[in-house]
């Protein structure tokens, strides 16, 4: 019996959240083509035979002077030290520079190099990219090109991970797929709906605060606030005749209901808090974990 923690690390938009959902077999983490979509750690748990693998999805590595982004990067770096193993994700379209920066981290556990988005190219380009990483072969334990549209890759990745985990009793009940607080999961489902429903810079200047969750036998009631920094952004989030906020609510309820398997009553409000992203205490205590 093995059990251990595996941190998913890589630059923004490398496909970490998509891979987490693929490996766990459930939609846990928000997925968006917009960069820096992931703001909180989300843990997913997968069983492979008798072995338990706890995945930690983290914000993407990037350079930024903004307080919120710095805290997001700190979350990602800290998760490396907390892990038994790292999956470093690199898009098939990227060069090796991000990986070389990762190798400069002194205290890091063993890692597997995952090449993502291979479905967007051909076998020749995949082989060429594998050749570019071959010079680092003494650094990684394995390198795996992955196409998450094909289920066969799931077993291959989990098998390689299980080989490297320590012998340990289960950290969590093997029947659960996440130990992340439901508030954080529901919050990200709502934020993902915001990302899909509005364009431009609005999602980057907004976040979600879950105020209350009331669970009953057949229904869960959720009260939440979408926080943004200007009245003009608030009007965009509301939309003409309330169309946008209605669309956000419909998408959010479906995602939460699909996950929780119960009927959802969602009360969404929009709250303006100017400069919230520069309020370090607010960001630390409410938005980034």
UniProtKB/Swiss-Prot annotation:
It is found in: Cytoplasm; Cell inner membrane. Keywords: Cell inner membrane, Cell membrane, Cytoplasm, GTP-binding, Membrane, Nucleotide-binding, Ribosome biogenesis, RNA-binding, rRNA-binding. Residues 146-148 are annotated as: G5. It is a peripheral membrane protein. GTP binds at residues 10-17, 57-61, 116-119. The keyword Nucleotide-binding applies. Residues 36-40 are annotated as: G2. One of its GO terms (biological process) is ribosomal small subunit assembly. Residues 57-60 are annotated as: G3. It comes from the Bacteria. InterPro entries: G_ERA_dom, GTP-bd, GTPase_Era-like, KH_dom-like_a/b, KH_dom_type_2, KH_sf_prok-type, P-loop_NTPase, Small_GTP-bd. One of its GO terms (molecular function) is GTP binding. Residues 116-119 are annotated as: G4. Belongs to the TRAFAC class TrmE-Era-EngA-EngB-Septin-like GTPase superfamily. Era GTPase family. Monomer. An essential GTPase that binds both GDP and GTP, with rapid nucleotide exchange. Plays a role in 16S rRNA processing and 30S ribosomal subunit biogenesis and possibly also in cell cycle regulation and energy metabolism. This is GTPase Era. The gene is era.
